[in-house]
Structure formats: structure tokens, C-alpha cells
């Protein structure tokens, strides 16, 4: 599944650049968020189904892979999305925001 996941991530980034180039003259901005692990019910369900009785240990292992020491919270991702859509970010287009607790650059 790593191949499909990586390909999809790359596709979102290049699609963002294409949209930004194609629509910038119309005043339409395009940016993308590139999060690392986000603590959602999906993570909890995955751990429960795949590591019964070891969920807490596996959760700690997942968090330890993040330089910041934890997974993102959905509200943190939403806050960046709200900013990108706001007038405060009116000069931002064609950008990819790594919101990953340092995973990309500090790992």
C-alpha cells in the first residue's frame, strides 16, 4: 500500500501546482496541506483491530516517530486550513504546507 499512498500524495501536490498555475490570473488560489499522522478514530480503530491488547504501546510507538512527540490533532489541521482560506493568506498560492510536527525536515 505504500506505493499507492506515496503516489497519491505526490499527485495531490502536483495537482495543486497545476491548479495554482491555471487559475492564478482569475484570482483563484490553490494550496495543499501535507499532514503526518493525525490522531483520529481511524487510528484508534486500526490499533484496536490490528494490535488487540497492545493498543497503548503501539500508540506510543506511533507518537514516538514524530519529532514533536505526538500526533497532530484534527483541530490543528483545521486551523491551518482555515488560515489558508482566509484573506490573511490572500498572497499564498501554489504552496504545500508540511503540518507534520517536524517529520519531514527534522527526522
What are these regions (language model features)?
Residues 1-4, 19, 42:
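Conserved catalytic loop/helix region of short-chain dehydrogenase/reductase
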Residues 8, 16:
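Active-site helix of classical SDR
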Residues 21-25, 90:
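Alpha-helical segment proximal to the catalytic Tyr-Lys
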Residues 25, 37-65:
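A glycine/serine/threonine-rich, flexible loop-to-helix segment
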Residues 54, 66-77:
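A conserved structural motif in NAD(P)-dependent oxidoreductases
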Residues 77-78, 84:
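Non-catalytic, hydrophobic alpha-helical segments
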Residues 82, 93-107:
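Short C-terminal tail/terminal secondary-structure segment
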